[in-house]
């Protein structure tokens, strides 16, 4: 039953040097070649499935695994010193296959190793980690033979020749396996230079770190005061007599804001008083505002018993002056001041009548000054007819002179200051004719609100326009 051990396949005979720096993560045991071959043998021979028992030895931070496989009631132990469970199981399967080959007769059929595509994947992963080019496979076919295909793989500038195979795919897999075995054998570097087992324990990667030269640690930098304020003292400029002084982070009066923004000077706006004169040369009508004097008395509309010479005011109408804008409005000049026109009372006023004697006219008393409403339009007052008044007749016809607004009468704007008007001395027309004036007896003069007149330049409605003498103060 015992047969001499089968010589190693030709792919293991490749002793070409492998590139340095092989990583321990890529190992041949990941191909599961020996476990697969042992499983196939058990199925062909009608044996039970191989059972693997793996043991963990050594300290927890550096564990060492050892595996044992049981097949046909026979146990086979793996090599000691593996750092992972899979490598230990692959080693146990390889040992079992080597012993089975020795024990079976020569005519016994041992299935060949079924290569898998995992070897090609592992070789490509190794090339990527080593920054090598993708492995290239070159296959050749011989003229005759059971295994006509032979494949060669090149990685890292080194070519690895695989064993012969029946198909091109199997030839590439065998070439990849040969390259992996060569890389692993060169990286581990066995002491005797050769071994009959392919799966052998490797060196721990962690030990290489200890060989690195110890770098001299750099001295730590001393941190400066961590509680140092990150802002500097704020400086403020003096503006408009308002100074801000800062000493030892102490604020004084005048520093209202704790910010980096410079303080803006205080802008004082003076409101225009009532007596301010606004002159606007670009506008047609100018606005003149005047504050009424303090000694102005309100005309009581409901009082009937007034002074004997006082003018009666109707209860429904207050003494008011209405200013209605006319068509030809005279514009107040820009530099003209507020003009106050008063009609001064005359003593022993006499009205000259054309073609007749002058009649004596009694003066109408003046009660201080009527309060002119600020927000109302100025109105005109019409003097009503008196009972015992001698009416002057012009052209031998009785007619009352009503002072009505003329078309070309100069009327101030609604916002122009109200003017206080007093009756003046006898008015004389330029052609020598005197206007008809009505003498107002005691408690007889009544201010009529429906009819209005305009103060200022007044023109009578007669054929000859009368003229009044106005004194401007």
Curated annotation (Swiss-Prot):
Stretches with biased composition (Polar residues): 433-450
GO biological process terms, semicolon-separated: regulation of gene expression; RNA processing
Biased composition (Basic and acidic residues): 286-307, 317-327, 416-427
Residue segments, region Disordered: 1-22, 286-329, 393-473
Pfam families with a match to the protein in the record: dsrm
GO MF annotations, alphabetized: double-stranded RNA binding; ribonuclease III activity
Record-annotated DRBM domain positions: 33-102, 118-185
Claim: Transmembrane is one of the keywords in the record: no
UniProt keyword list: Repeat, RNA-binding
Entry annotated with the keyword Repeat: yes
Compositional bias of kind Pro residues: 1-10
InterPro entries listed in its UniProt record: dsRBD_dom
Function recorded in the entry: Binds double-stranded RNA.
Name of the protein described by the UniProt record: Double-stranded RNA-binding protein 7
Gene: DRB7
């Amino acid at each position: 039953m015992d047969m001499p051990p089968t010589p190693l396949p030709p792919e293991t005979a490749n002793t070409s040097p492998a590139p340095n720096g092989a990583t321990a993560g890529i190992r041949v045991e990941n191909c599961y070649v020996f476990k697969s071959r042992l499983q196939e043998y058990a199925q062909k021979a009608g044996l039970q499935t191989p059972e693997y028992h793996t043991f963990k030895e050594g300290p927890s931070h550096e564990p060492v695994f050892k595996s044992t496989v049981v097949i046909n009631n026979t146990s086979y132990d793996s090599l000691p010193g593996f750092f992972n469970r899979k490598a230990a199981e692959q080693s146990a399967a390889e040992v079992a296959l080597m012993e089975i080959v020795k024990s079976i007769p020569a005519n016994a059929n041992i299935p060949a190793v079924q290569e898998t595509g995992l070897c090609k994947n592992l070789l490509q992963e190794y090339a990527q980690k080593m920054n090598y080019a993708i492995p290239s496979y070159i296959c050749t076919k011989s003229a005759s033979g059971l295994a006509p295909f032979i494949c060669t793989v090149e990685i890292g500038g080194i070519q690895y020749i695989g064993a012969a195979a029946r198909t091109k795919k199997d030839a590439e897999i065998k070439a990849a396996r040969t390259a992996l075995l060569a890389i692993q054998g060169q990286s581990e570097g066995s002491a005797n230079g050769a071994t009959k087992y392919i799966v052998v324990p490797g060196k721990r990667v962690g030990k290489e770190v200890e060989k690195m030269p110890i770098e001299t640690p750099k001295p730590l930098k001393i941190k400066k005061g961590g509680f140092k304020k990150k802002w500097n003292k704020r400086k403020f400029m003096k503006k408009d007599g308002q100074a801000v002084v800062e000493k030892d982070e102490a604020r004084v009066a005048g520093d209202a804001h704790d910010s980096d923004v410079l303080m803006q000077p205080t802008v004082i706006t003076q409101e225009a008083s009532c007596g301010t004169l606004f002159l606007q040369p670009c506008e047609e009508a100018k606005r003149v505002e005047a504050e009424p004097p303090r000694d102005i008395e309100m005309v009581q509309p409901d009082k009937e018993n007034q002074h004997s010479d006082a003018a009666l005011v109707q209860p429904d109408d207050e003494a008011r002056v209405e200013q209605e804008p006319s068509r030809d409005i005279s514009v107040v000049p820009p530099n003209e001041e507020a003009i106050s026109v008063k009609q001064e009372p005359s003593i022993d006023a006499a009205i000259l009548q054309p073609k007749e004697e002058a009649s004596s006219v009694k003066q109408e008393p003046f009660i201080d000054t009527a309060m002119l409403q600020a927000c109302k339009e100025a109105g005109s007052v019409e003097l009503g007819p008196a009972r015992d008044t001698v009416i002057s007749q012009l052209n031998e016809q009785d007619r009352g002179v009503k002072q009505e607004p003329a078309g070309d009468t100069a009327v101030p704007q609604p916002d122009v200051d109200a003017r206080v008007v007093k009756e003046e001395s006898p008015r004389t027309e330029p052609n020598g004719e005197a206007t008809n004036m009505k003498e107002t007896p005691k408690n007889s003069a009544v201010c009529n609100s429906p009819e209005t007149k305009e103060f200022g330049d007044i023109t009578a409605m007669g054929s000859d326009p009368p003229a009044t003498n106005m004194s401007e103060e």
